[in-house]
Amino acid sequence: MNWRSEHIWIELITGSRKTSNFCWACILFLGSLGFLVVGTSSYLGKNLISVFPSQQILFFPQGIVMSFYGIAGLFISSYLWCTISWNVGSGYDRFDRKEGIMSLFRWGFPGRDRRIFLRFFLKDIQSIRMEVREGLFPRRVLYMEIKGQGAIPLTRTDEDLTPREIEQKAAELAYFLRVPIEVF
């Protein structure tokens, strides 16, 4: 969701609370739980899951490996669930022509620097830069070139924007900020 007026442009940034992250976290959790249960049932010699008889899977080496994969998968799954619950990467970009200030806010991982807040003067923005790479792994990223700071990405690298969408977004933002567009 974006909000625009004559003097203010606010663009909300989606963080890690995306449908794909929810799906991967669920799949990884259920798969690793299955591996751990099969490894445990091979160790105990009892059928905890009725799909595989425990005699078919020996504890050494298959049961140990499956237990290890199950534990590793649970750790990775818990990491994904934590990033989803903390909503890492979400935030907003706020451009205020009236005050002449641009603000970037993102949520990070818990700790001292959880809130990432950057402020720049609009007069320091040199250009809006588009990086477009086509091919097997296309990459379309929008950057903002700032004096003394370099390029700051405005779109996520995993955002699948069509060339028309990124071009339109760059043109609208450059028009709003009254800066040129560079294409790389």
Swiss-Prot record:
The keyword Cell inner membrane does not apply. It holds the Pfam family Ycf4. One of its GO terms (biological process) is photosynthesis. It is found in: Plastid, Chloroplast thylakoid membrane. The chain crosses the membrane at residues 22-42, 57-77. The keyword Thylakoid applies. It is a multi-pass membrane protein. InterPro entries: PSI_Ycf4_assembly (IPR003359). GO terms for cellular component: chloroplast thylakoid membrane; photosystem I. Keywords: Chloroplast, Membrane, Photosynthesis, Plastid, Thylakoid, Transmembrane, Transmembrane helix. Belongs to the Ycf4 family. Seems to be required for the assembly of the photosystem I complex. This is Photosystem I assembly protein Ycf4. It comes from Phalaenopsis aphrodite subsp. formosana (Moth orchid).
